[in-house]
Amino acid sequence: MSQRQQFQFLLSFLILIFLKFIIQIRCDESNGVIIIKNIEDGGSGSGTVSYCQMEQIRDEYITIKTNYGIVSSIGSTTASGSVDGKKEFSLIFNQLIPSDIGYEYFFLRWGTNKQTIATLTDPFLNPYRFNIVHLNRTDLYSIQPTTNNSYLVENLNSISKQVTFNSLIFVNRKSPFFFIFSNFNKVCDNKNNFNMEILYPNNNNNDDFNNSNNNNVDNSNFCSSIQYGNQLVTIKSMSSGNYISSEGSTNAWDIGNKFIKTIPLSSELTDSNYFKIITFENNKIGFLDKFKSFWSWNNTNVEVSSTMLKNQKFNLEPVLNNPSCSKNCYYIKTGNSGYIKEYITKNSVNGNLLNSGSSDDKTMFLIKLLPICSKDINNYGTSSSTTSTTSSSSSSSSSTTTATTMATTTTSKITTTSNINDSFGDDENLINSSSVIKFSTPIIMIIIILINIKF
C-alpha cells in the first residue's frame, strides 16, 4: 500500500470515528423515557386497558420553544392543510425539563362523564395551532396571545368557550379534558425552581368555570420538593388531595397512562436497572411513595395503592415469555420487599375489579422503557404497524388526515383499546438520533469519495 493510500485510509477512518462520535452525543442528549402501563391479570376484554401497548416512535423529535425552556412533544406532524400557513401539531405533552436531564412525558387524559380543565402557565413565543389527540377524535385548537401575558384558546372544530386568563385555560364543551404543564416562570420557594398549577372544576354540570363556586379548586401554595439528579425542583399543587368525582364514584381523578422519567440513583451503582422513579402521587410529583394505578371498568375508575418507602430503590426486572408484552418491558421489583404486593385481578363472573396481593405475583405494574436512541428504534412505527381497532379515525373534526392516521396506528404485536398513541412525527428542522444515523451514511460515503478524488 502506497503512502498516499495509507493516508487516504487513515483520513477516512478518522472521519468515520468523528461522525460516529457526533451521532452518539446527539443520541445521548435525548435519553430514554419509561412508561407505566396498567397490566391486568387475564385476557383482554371490552372496557379493559391495553396490555403493555407499544408506543409508536417515529424518527424525529418535535420541540416548541417557549420563554422558559423547551416543550417536548410527541405525535407531531406538518399538516398539508395548515391554517394560515401555520403548522399543526398533534400533541400529547409534557413538562419542561433541563436538557441535561432529558425529557419527561405525561399523557393528555380525556375525561369521560366528568368536566376537567387545566391551566398552561408558560407563555408561548408565537401563536400555534395544534391538534390534541385523545380517545376517539382529534380537535384543532388555536393559541393566540392577547395582552398582559394572557392567552386565548379556541377549539376550531367544536363549540367551545373562549377564555382569556393570566394563564392559559382550555375549555372544550364537547370534549372536556385537562392537561398538566409546568413552567419556570413562577416559583414556590424563591430558588428559581419551577411550579405546577392544576385547577379542577366541579362535577355539577355547571358550564361555567368559577373558582368561587368550585368546591374542588384549591389554590393554596402547597409546595413539594422533588429532585432531578442533583437539582431540586418544587411544584405547586393541591394540598387537600381532593379528587374529581365521576358518576357514582369517588377518587376518580387520574392522569391516564403515566409517563415517568427514570434517573440513576448514583454513579457508583454498576447495575443500570436501579432508578429513582418519579410519578404522580396525591396530585403532586414526587418519588414513588404510594404507587397509584387507575383502572377503568364499566366507566368506573378504581384506585389501587401500594405503599413504598420514600426514595426506595427499584429494580427493573425484564419480562420474559410474556406474549402480551413486547421487549423492553420490566417488572418493578423493590430492594426490600420483593415485587409490589398489591395488584388487581378481574373477577370473570361479574367483571368487577378486586384487590388482592401476593409478594410473588408479577401480574401488576408492567413498565416499558422506550429506547429513544436504541438500535431497535426502527422496530417502532415502521411498516409492520397495523391500523388499530379504535375509533379515532372516525373523527369528525377538520384536522389533517396525517394526524388522524397517526392517532390510529399501533404496532401489530399489541392489542390496544385506549387509542392514545404517542408517535414521533415529521418535522424537517428537528432531529432524532435515528434520523441522524440514516442521513449520515450517504454523507460519509460522499466525503470518502471526495477524498479519493482529491488524492
Curated annotation (Swiss-Prot):
Keyword set includes S-adenosyl-L-methionine: no
Keywords: Glycoprotein, Membrane, Signal, Transmembrane, Transmembrane helix
Compartment(s) of residence: Membrane
Stretches the record annotates as Disordered: 383-402
Record: glycosylation sites: N136, N148, N210, N298, N421, N432
Membrane spanning stretches: 435-455
Gene Ontology cellular-component annotations: membrane
UniProt signal peptide: 1-27
Membrane topology: Single-pass type I membrane protein
Superkingdom in the source lineage: Eukaryota
Keyword Membrane listed: yes
Membrane side Extracellular: residue ranges: 29-434
UniProt name for this protein: Putative uncharacterized transmembrane protein DDB_G0290991
